[in-house]
Regions:
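Long, low-complexity N-terminal extensions
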Residues: 1-263
Length: 263
């Protein structure tokens, strides 16, 4: 059955800008999360994610645990995603909504590139993600919160950059490192103790993995490392060459001496 009430965009039809969301809004198809009234439901939540700069880019990492109240709902949740060729995004908060928001964000970046023939600047990407978080404000007031981290390689400034956000869509440039989620304070404290501007790739990867371990030791909602079962953080490295995902084999090699050295 074909629905003829909503047809394709016609040639010459006005669109506000080269935004996929604007196209959806024009057709009345934009995603809307609404909850009239508050009911006592238990939601699956993603927990600790982090990012830190190093000499040639940014490392972004996230643990794999998702919780529903005091219950461990999942032990292999992916929280760090490639946004496009030179940026990545990590999620914390209400897991289902966060994953959908990131899918839409990635589609938005792809749509913009197809329409404009060029990519958004890194600041433009960060600003658009802030706009999307702000669009979720009514749900945030009812406890359905999504707070991501965003990072990328800025070709104009020739360095890695990272951004944090608050629940109302405020965007903040972070110079060295950023964390969010239930174990964010512990991870941040560890990164503060080890970060320096001359970190190598290997040192940054080690710091990211050990920060997850430190957070898991203090926060029950953060999943630690389990080499026997193959449960390891998912980690991305962003440089001028693009986004690289670190394999479980490489992460295990990084993690083993860290775990051996913990008291």
């Amino acid at each position: 059955v074909t629905d003829t009430s909503i047809g394709p965009l016609q040639i010459g039809e006005s669109v506000a800008d080269a935004s996929f969301l604007s196209v959806l809004e024009l057709r009345g198809l934009d995603p809307r999360w609404e909850a009239d009234g508050v009911s006592p439901i238990t939601l699956t939540e993603a927990t600790t994610v982090l990012a830190l700069t190093w000499s040639d880019g940014v490392v972004m990492a996230g643990d794999r645990r998702a919780t529903a109240g005091n219950y461990i709902a999942h032990s292999r949740v992916r929280k760090v995603y490639e946004a496009d060729r030179h940026s990545a995004v990590a999620i914390s908060g209400t897991a289902g909504m966060a994953v959908e928001l990131i899918k839409l964000f990635r589609t938005e970046l792809e749509h913009y590139e197809k329409i404009e023939g060029s990519t958004l600047s890194l600041d433009g990407k960060a600003n658009f993600l802030a706009r999307m978080i702000r669009g979720n404000l009514s749900m945030a007031f009812q406890g359905l919160v999504v707070i991501p981290l965003f990072c990328g390689y800025d070709k104009r400034q020739e360095k890695g950059r990272l951004f944090s956000y608050d629940v109302v869509g405020g965007r903040y440039d972070e110079l060295n490192f950023a964390t969010t989620g239930s174990g964010g304070a512990e991870a941040r404290s560890f990164l503060k103790s080890v970060w320096n501007e001359d970190l190598t790739r290997e040192q940054a990867l080690g710091a990211a993995v050990e920060a997850i371990v430190a957070a898991a030791e203090e926060d029950s909602a953060t999943g630690g490392l389990d080499l026997k079962r193959g449960i390891l953080p998912n980690v991305l490295v962003v440089t001028a060459d693009g986004v690289e995902e670190i394999s479980d084999e490489d992460l295990a090699a990084i993690a083993q001496p860290i775990l051996d050295g913990r008291p």
